[in-house]
Each structure stands twice: as structure tokens, then as C-alpha cells.
Amino acid sequence: AGLNDAQRRAVDHHVGPLLVVAGAGSGKTRALTHRIAHLIGEHGADPAQILAVTFTNKAAREMKERLEFLLAQRLAQSQYGQPWSTLPPVEQRQLRSRIYREVTKELWIGTFHALFARMLRYDIDKFKDAEGLTWTKQFSIYDEADAQSLVKEIVTQELQLDPKRFEPKKTRWAISNAKNQGWLPDQLEANAEGQRGKLTADVYRRYRKALAANNALDFDDLLLLPVQLLQQNEQVRSYWH
């Protein structure tokens, strides 16, 4: 399958954890993709029990496409007894469509943000927010431009602060930094220094309420809320283990 000896050992490893240490461009993604295909094709692994995390959405798409092709090649040989390249285009499309329905669609391949968003689509209704806020499974996701626009609206319209002295962009960064530390507004306020820090915590509190009112999450929430949900709910933790 075009793998070197080290890649083949990684692909064939079956029981227990395996750590692969290799530099950029050495074929780690290739080995991982072949390993997933090997686990499904040779060991009958359940696709829904396989998790692969990438840094970018592009890498996730490419991994899924490669995997579909590898599994379609296997299926062509087992079902038709002939190489993939000799199949008519219509049968190739049918095989890839079948692989997508039965395998690719069930796999958990994506970035941390994408995978956690998928998790929240299942279980966000079980999340108990410390400030009593709620979201439904149909939540929308605000990109950075949406988030900055909302913070600016709170700073300039709700609190009527001078945006030149209390910059919305810096405030948004401070809120993002707080979320990445796992802090809610009360924790940010407790660690704040001076009036500016107190105001930032106030903006953060209003920002969260505005997000919830719009049934929206920002990118930081996609990491923070799942962690909090898993910490607080044993049933959810057991399900996703």
C-alpha cells in the first residue's frame, strides 16, 4: 500500500496505545488513515468508535476522502473480485456512496472545535450553566467577526463607553483569554485589577447573556462548554468515554 516499514508497524498495531513521534512531512497522516482503514476492514471496528483529531478542517476533509478511497478499494476487491481502477465509473460512485453512508458519516474525524460542536449537538440540553443560561441543540456558532461585533455593541451601546479608551477588540481578547482559562465572569472579576478589569468582567457577563439570548456560541465556548459538561454530568461522561 506504499507504506514504509515504520508506517506499516503503526498500521498493524492493534492492542493498546501507540505513540508515533515523527517530523513534518514524514507520513503520519498517511499512516493514521491506513490504520483506520485497517481497523475497519480487517478487525471490524465500529466507525462510530473511532476518533481522529486534526488541526484544520482541510486536513479532516482530506483524511475522510483518503479513507473513503482506501475502503472503496478494499470493497471493490472483495465484492467484485477486481481492482478499483478497472471498475466502471458508475460502480465506483456507488461504492464510494456506500462507504460514506456506512463508514465515513459515522467516524469522528475533525478539529477539536468541530468534534466538540458535534458533541454539543447531542448533549447541550444537559449542560447546567453557573449563571442559569441555556442553549438548544440548534445553536448557531459565531465567528470572530460576529463575536467582536457583539462585544462592540455592548461596550458602545449598552454601557456607552468610549471605544477609544475601552477598546472592544482588546475586551474581546480578554474575554477569550478568560474562557481559555476556564473562567466565568465572576472568576474574571475576582482576578481583575482596577476599574477596567471590573468593566471587562461586566462586558463578559453581558456578552454571555447576549449569546444565550441568540442561542449562539463562540469558538471558545466550543471548547469550554464540553469540558464543563463532562465535569458536571457523570452520565454524559460515561457515554462519551
Specify the residue positions occupied by each region the protein language model found.
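N-terminal alpha-helical segment
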Residues: 3, 32, 203, 219-222, ...
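ATP-hydrolysis module of ASCE/P-loop NTPase motor domains
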Residues: 100-107, 124-221
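Hydrophobic residues in alpha-helical segments
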Residues: 40, 211-212, 230-231
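A short structural micro-motif
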Residues: 17, 181, 229-232
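P-loop NTPase Walker
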Residues: 1-129, 141, 214, 238
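Short basic/glycine-enriched coil/helix segment immediately N-terminal to the Walker B
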Residues: 230-241
